[in-house]
């Protein structure tokens, strides 16, 4: 059998073993599809499950990636696809039902971990030219696939594509350096960008470091000369450039859509490059423990005992030259600097705040560790004297690492002694089995048993680590998911059967409710294919978020609008005709003929406006001065052509109860009107808002709304009070808040800023000082005024119009000085024509489309064209042509050189 085929078969078997055993974990530990647990936790549960349901609809033609009104008010989801959904593993969605998506998620994790084992095996076999024994290759490949990162980040399924492509990229770097070939490097970089540009960026940054590292190793071994290395540097840059070109079909539109409008760089980013060290290197050793998780200043590279013993032996072995130790030491130090020095950590996180998932690039460090172990094992035991020395060496490494790990745990004052001692025991046991293996190489039976025990121990410890991490990261809601999907699908189908017009649907409850009525699953409109006003992703358009914020739906971290209530005039303007709610909402009318499902009834907004109507004027863009109530009044006044007072302020008496509590007493509420409140805050206080003894909601913190409805009895006084940091049990925790510098400068004096104690993320401020800045806005909504203005605008509904994903058409009569309002966002990419002529549209609220009309009949057409998509296609094609051309030229050069050497 040819050598390449043997390597492929062995890699395939390794991949199958890893994937099948991962699925066996699911069966053993009751994960979907065999139980009610799932790896789809955290953001996977909140966002990604709905994304996969949406992708399934796109695959079957029921929705669109190109442009979809199911995503927020409407946007292109090419950037979302490029980041979350582009993996080829997602093609499995074609063969499952939406009720089985949690099962798909777990199976997809297993497939990607199998691929990681396979590509790692291919790398190790090829890079070491068969010098690394098969048993080491298998164990180290499995260690890479089942490393801590794989299960810690399993919920971020899209990042696992980077895990299995990294070995191919780094093997491509080696090919480029040693043989001057670029095909694998360019192709793997291009594929990585296409599958997930984020991990592709991380892997490419690491590949730069790896190029220097490999070049130094090859120079030290005398395999290449310095002049060759310099020439190969230009070849490497050329190859990486071709790889980027290949990925341009998705990467270029993503750059425009994601970075150009979504607010990809979030709040607090001014601090990303502060010169600051997070921690010391002891934490990296302490983090090499079974079940350990990465956190700020503590990275976990755990991938079993075999890898760490081999890496330690690499540094302490007499066979490792001083130069090679220096090269590997500098590479390791560079990596840890990227973990613990804030500016470098920010670069490797691609300039994203990593608060939620620290060390997203930890898989690169684990690969470095495994590589160093492979270097050692590839050279170990080559002579009888080596076997004697190696046996003692692995014992020293195992025992030494175990006790150093214990020392680091005590230095860092970690209390999880059970996992600490278990990790130590496994490392020592592994070193003893390796010792027996090297000491008894002549006694085949003993050496075979010793290595078999090493194999069993490696599989067992990695399996146990997987079990612990999976348990810590799991979701336990997989059993409830199918029932919710069926009921939600049926409810949306009921609404569409009840009303087949053009409208949006909102909801105040989703699949899971957090504490006190907050929720984060804002992508259900994408999953169940209806038009809404909400979505949650890193690819939201910033202009959309700002508009929604102005009309009362708060912008949360530039990734979602908090839509967990109904602001009647705002919903009416957006064409939200139906609201799915667990409880009655003042002003909405329950539709008794539609069945209550998932604890939600269907309510109709009687004030909902049509999606297209004519108004007098050319654009309505009032200035926003921080008050959503007055801004909504101004919008309606502009559309109606006369002053409209929907909201009127109501006097409220504020009382400071203590350092952490403020209350407001609202008096003289106009009879028959709906009361709303808003308590603008300068910085989060993670509070609990008590609304007139009727309900509570988290407020002034993560996922909390801005505007809120206040139920009251006619003629009574309404009372609202806010408790700051309500769930803190420690007084010190409650008394001081960590405030970002951007927030702090909005209310602290220069003296306070100068005197304040700085934190890793900002400045410490007393909670009472933040509460000093709280103020209350209380407004009454006049339903009669709302009824009057909406009837006036409804009477101007466009004569004939249709709205579809990516295409809007309208025929209406008009005259000069009038405009057509469309409840469609003015995204980049819309080409708008009026009577066949391309025009520039105005806006309403600086976001919704307003088309100026002319006298007579106006035929309006809007068609969405993907910005730079065609250019991206051409660049990808150019990249493939350049790769083919360059590979042919390099092949000819190598053949000529080989023929010349043969002569």
Give residue ranges: language-model regions.
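Contiguous transmembrane helix-bundle modules in multi-pass membrane proteins
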Residues: 176, 199, 326-337, 341-346, ...
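Hydrophobic alpha-helical membrane-insertion signals
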Residues: 5-78, 474-526
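Membrane-interface micro-motifs in multi-pass membrane enzymes
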Residues: 78-82, 105-115, 136-138, 143-167, ...
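Membrane-embedded helix bundles of polyisoprenyl
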Residues: 18, 113-126, 133-219, 235-255, ...
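Periplasmic/ER-lumenal interhelical loops and adjacent helix-loop junctions
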Residues: 42, 46-57, 88, 232-235, ...
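Extracytoplasmic/lumenal acceptor-recognition loop(s) of multi-pass membrane glycoenzymes
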Residues: 457-479, 494-571, 607-610, 614-641, ...
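Membrane-interface coil-to-helix junctions
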Residues: 21-117, 142-163, 202, 258-263, ...
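Active-site-proximal, structured, solvent-exposed surfaces of multi-pass membrane proteins
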Residues: 4, 51, 642-903
């Amino acid at each position: 059998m040819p050598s390449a085929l043997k390597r492929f078969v062995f890699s395939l078997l390794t991949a199958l073993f890893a994937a099948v055993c991962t699925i066996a974990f699911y069966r053993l530990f009751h994960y979907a599809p065999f139980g009610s647990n799932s790896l789809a936790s955290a953001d996977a549960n909140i966002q990604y499950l709905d994304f996969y349901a949406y992708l399934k609809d796109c695959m079957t033609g029921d929705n669109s990636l190109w442009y979809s009104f199911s995503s927020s008010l409407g946007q292109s989801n090419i950037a979302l696809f490029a980041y979350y959904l582009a993996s080829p593993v997602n093609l499995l969605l074609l063969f499952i039902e939406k009720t089985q998506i949690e099962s798909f998620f777990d199976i997809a994790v297993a497939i990607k971990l199998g691929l990681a084992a396979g590509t790692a095996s291919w790398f190790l076999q090829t890079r070491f030219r068969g010098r690394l024994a098969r048993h080491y290759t298998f164990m180290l490949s499995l260690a890479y696939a089942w490393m801590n990162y794989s299960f810690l980040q399993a919920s971020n399924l899209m990042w696992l594509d980077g895990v299995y492509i990294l070995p191919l990229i780094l093997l491509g770097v080696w090919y480029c350096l040693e043989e001057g070939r670029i095909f694998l490097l360019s192709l793997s970089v291009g594929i990585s960008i296409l599958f997930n540009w984020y991990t592709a960026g991380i892997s490419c940054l690491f590949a730069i470091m790896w190029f220097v590292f490999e070049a130094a190793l090859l120079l030290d071994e005398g395999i290449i000369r310095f002049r060759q290395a310099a020439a190969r540097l230009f070849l490497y840059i050329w190859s990486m450039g071709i790889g980027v070109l290949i990925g341009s079909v998705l990467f270029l539109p993503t750059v425009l859509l994601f970075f150009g409008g979504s607010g990809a760089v979030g709040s607090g980013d001014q601090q990303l490059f502060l010169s600051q060290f997070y921690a010391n290197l002891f934490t990296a050793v302490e983090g090499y423990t079974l079940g350990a998780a990465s956190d700020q200043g503590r990275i976990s590279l755990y991938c079993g005992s075999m890898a760490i013993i081999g890496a330690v032996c690499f540094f302490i072995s007499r066979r490792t030259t001083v130069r090679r130790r220096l090269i590997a030491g500098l590479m390791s130090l560079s990596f840890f600097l990227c973990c613990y020095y804030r500016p470098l950590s920010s670069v490797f996180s691609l300039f994203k705040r990593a608060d939620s998932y620290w060390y997203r690039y930890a898989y690169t460090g684990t690969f470095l560790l495994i590589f160093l172990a492979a270097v050692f094992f590839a050279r170990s035991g080559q002579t009888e004297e080596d076997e004697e020395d190696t046996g003692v060496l692995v014992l020293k490494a195992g025992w030494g690492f175990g006790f150093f790990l214990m020392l680091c745990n005590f230095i860092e004052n970690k209390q999880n002694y059970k996992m600490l001692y278990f990790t130590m025991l496994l490392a020592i046991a592994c070193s003893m089995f390796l010792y027996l293996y090297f000491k008894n190489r002549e006694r085949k039976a003993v050496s075979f048993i010793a290595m078999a025990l090493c194999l069993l121990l490696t599989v067992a410890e990695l399996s146990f680590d997987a079990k612990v991490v999976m348990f810590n990261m799991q979701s336990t809601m997989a059993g409830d998911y199918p029932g919710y999907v069926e009921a939600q699908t049926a409810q949306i189908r009921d609404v569409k059967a009840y009303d087949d017009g053009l409208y949006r649907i909102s909801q105040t409850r989703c699949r899971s409710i957090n504490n006190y009525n907050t929720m984060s699953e804002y992508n259900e409109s994408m999953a169940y294919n209806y038009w809404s006003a909400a979505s949650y992703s890193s690819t939201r358009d910033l202009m959309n978020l700002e508009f929604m914020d102005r009309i009362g739906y708060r912008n949360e971290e530039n990734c979602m609008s908090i839509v967990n209530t109904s602001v009647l005039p705002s919903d009416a303007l957006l064409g939200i005709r139906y609201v799915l709610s667990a409880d009655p909402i003042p002003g909405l009318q329950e539709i008794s003929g539609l069945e209550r499902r998932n604890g939600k009834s269907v309510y109709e907004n009687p004030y909902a406006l049509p999606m297209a109507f004519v108004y007098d004027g050319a654009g309505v863009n009032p200035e926003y001065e921080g008050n959503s109530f007055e801004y909504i009044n101004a919008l309606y006044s502009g559309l109606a052509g006369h002053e409209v007072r929907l909201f009127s302020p109501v006097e409220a008496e504020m009382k400071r109860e203590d350092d952490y509590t403020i209350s407001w007493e609202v008096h003289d509420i106009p009879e028959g009107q709906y009361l709303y409140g808003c308590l603008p805050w300068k910085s989060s206080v993670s509070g609990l808002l008590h609304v007139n003894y009727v309900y509570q909601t988290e407020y002034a913190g993560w996922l909390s709304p801005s505007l809120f409805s206040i139920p009251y009895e006619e003629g009574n006084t309404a009372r609202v009070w806010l408790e700051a940091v309500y769930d803190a049990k420690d007084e010190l925790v409650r008394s001081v808040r960590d405030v970002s510098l951007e927030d702090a400068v909005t209310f602290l004096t220069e003296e306070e800023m100068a005197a304040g104690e700085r934190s890793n993320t900002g400045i410490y401020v007393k909670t009472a000082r933040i509460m000093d800045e709280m103020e209350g806005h209380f407004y009454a909504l006049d339903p009669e005024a709302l009824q009057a203005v909406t009837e006036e605008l409804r009477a101007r509904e466009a004569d004939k119009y249709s709205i579809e994903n990516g295409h809007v058409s309208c025929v209406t009569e008009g005259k000069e000085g009038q405009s057509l309002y469309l409840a469609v966002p003015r995204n980049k990419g819309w080409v708008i024509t009026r009577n066949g002529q391309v025009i520039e549209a105005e806006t309403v609220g600086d976001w919704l489309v307003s088309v100026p009309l002319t006298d007579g009949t106006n035929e309006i057409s809007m068609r969405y064209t993907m910005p730079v998509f065609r250019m991206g296609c051409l660049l990808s094609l150019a990249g493939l042509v350049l790769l083919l051309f360059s590979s042919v030229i390099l092949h000819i050069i190598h053949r000529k050189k080989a023929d010349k050497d043969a002569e």
